[in-house]
A protein has these predicted regions:
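Residues located in well-ordered beta-strands
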Residues: 16-18, 28, 33, 45, ...
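Adenosine-nucleotide cofactor-binding segment
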Residues: 200-206, 215-282
Length: 325
């Protein structure tokens, strides 16, 4: 196990990180120096990280995150050092990193941190809430704390709120995606949609998030689990983890009618993972009366969903966003 970091030698600790200097650019591997670790922060030596579509999306966006920045938000590793106010983690603990939150707003107090009133500041801006950064690069400060972690590096400065201790470190390098993609898909089904054993659910888009949703629906023993995607390989994997029906979206002339044919009157709930507004509309239209459509896809700011309001009103349908499950 790693030796704890000497609090008086922060300037000696360096990390290798994939740094993005401008929107649409390529990552540059650079050596960063840790400037400080605050009393309420945790330093994690990363073992592995997943790559989420959100990371790729933010690479091309000139807004939200100033540069240079370290992205990544599906990290897993071991606690290397802790600040004096950290209560629940110790050096050597295996952890999976997830999103951050303020910890004290109305949503956080209600144990709904993914709807934190200050979510953007704690996750998208890639800096501490006070605007500072812990890492120094060759040409100046480098933004970190993307989703509270910036895991495209060998070390991560995070908070104990978003460093989840694991009971076992077996295959820890495989656990990173649990902190975002898998919890988003599975959590949307387990915590929000909650299909009953007599009900039907449709998952639009079965990449990692959608497959996690299918697995959760399987665990809840939903009667019908319909997966919709454009790739045969994904649909085949969806079958392997519990989908009872699959639809190849680009080969089905009327997806909504096909779903209603399978389910009888429409799905009880649906989940869109694609952020495609045409697909999201289908996810709403395929519902039976009083059905619920949840969406988790990261749509661009300003995206507009065009739906038949009369259909939603008369059908008593619900359409809601879901963040991090």
């Amino acid at each position: 196990m790693n030796t704890p970091l000497n609090p008086n030698a922060f300037h000696e600790l360096t990390a290798q990180a994939a740094v993005l200097h401008h929107a649409g650019g390529q990552f540059s591997m650079e050596t960063l120096t840790l400037k400080d670790l605050r009393d309420d922060e945790v330093l994690v030596k990363l073992l592995a990280t997943g790559v989420c579509h959100t990371d790729i999306s933010f690479m091309g966006r000139p807004f939200m995150v100033d540069k240079p920045v370290v992205l990544g938000h599906e990290g897993a590793g071991y606690v290397y050092a802790v600040g004096s106010q950290v209560k629940h983690l110790r050096v050597g603990d295996p952890v999976v990193l997830s999103f951050d939150a303020c910890g004290h707003c109305e949503s956080c107090e209600a144990h709904q941190p993914s709807y934190c009133h200050d979510f953007i500041n704690h996750n998208f801006l890639a800096q501490r809430p006070d605007g500072t950064t812990a890492w120094q690069g060759p040409s100046g400060p480098v933004r970190h704390a993307f989703f509270g972690q910036s895991s495209f590096a060998t070390y991560s400065v995070c908070h104990e709120r978003n460093a989840i201790k694991m009971d076992d470190d077996h295959d820890l390098e495989m656990f990173g995606p649990l902190g975002c993609g898998f919890q988003t898909g599975a959590g949307a089904v387990l915590n929000v949609l909650q299909p009953k054993t007599s009900q039907a659910i449709v998952v639009f888009g079965v990449g990692s998030v959608g497959l996690a949703a299918v697995m959760a629906a399987t665990a809840m023993k939903a009667r019908q689990i319909i997966a919709v995607d454009l790739k045969d390989s994904r649909l085949e994997m969806a079958k392997q983890v519990g989908a009872t029906h699959t639809i190849r979206g680009d080969q089905c002339p009327d997806i909504v009618s096909e779903i209603k044919s399978i389910t009888g009157a429409g799905a009880h709930c649906s989940l869109d993972t694609t952020a495609n507004m045409t697909v999201l509309r289908q996810a709403v239209e395929c519902l039976r009366p009083q059905g619920v459509c949840g969406f988790v896809g990261g749509a661009s700011a300003g995206s507009e969903l065009v739906v038949d309001v009369r259909d939603i009103m008369i059908g008593g349908k619900t359409v809601r966003g879901i963040v991090e499950g």
